[in-house]
């Protein structure tokens, strides 16, 4: 609550935030997948009448917290940036692109404690200590062989459709 109260007054929720994962991490999002996700989520924001913001971890703490406090939805790969969802208002949609196999789901527990609407989207995932990729329909989880443009765009579009449906419900 102290973090939420530090952003006064409570801002109007009008943003879809893409919490991009840094490229220096072992579990990075490939440039092609990142571009597909950003384009699909930007479109989802426009369809939902929301402002689209890409989280920048180079900003000051206050600049990083502000978009999360105004978010209707936050989408991002498993990583520290999703911890900024502690600034989100109850009911905010939090969509995590997971690391598989799941060992512990910190963000689901955090979302439950904060009253956020948590969703896991396993169609875009990372194997433990590997890059995030689009999932192959025949594989249990992410398969590097399917990291082509069509698969990336289809997976990103599917994610965007799920986000729009959840926002509208």
Each model region followed by its residue ranges:
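The feature primarily captures lumenal catalytic ectodomains
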Residues: 1-169
């Amino acid at each position: 609550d102290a973090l939420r109260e530090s952003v006064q007054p409570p801002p109007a929720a009008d943003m879809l935030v893409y919490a991009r994962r840094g490229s220096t991490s072992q579990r990075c999002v490939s440039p092609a997948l990142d571009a597909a996700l950003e384009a699909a989520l930007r479109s989802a924001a426009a369809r939902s009448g929301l402002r689209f913001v890409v989280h920048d971890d180079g900003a000051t703490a206050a600049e990083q917290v502000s978009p999360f406090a105004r978010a209707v939805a936050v989408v991002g790969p498993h990583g520290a940036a999703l911890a900024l969802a502690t600034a989100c208002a109850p009911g905010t949609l939090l969509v995590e692109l997971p690391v598989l196999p799941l060992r512990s789901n910190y963000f689901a527990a955090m979302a439950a404690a904060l009253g956020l609407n948590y969703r896991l989207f396993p169609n875009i995932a990372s194997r433990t200590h590997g890059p995030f990729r689009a999932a192959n329909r025949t594989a249990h989880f992410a398969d590097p062989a399917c990291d082509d443009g069509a698969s990336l765009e289809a997976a990103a579009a599917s994610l965007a459709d799920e986000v729009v449906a959840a926002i509208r419900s």
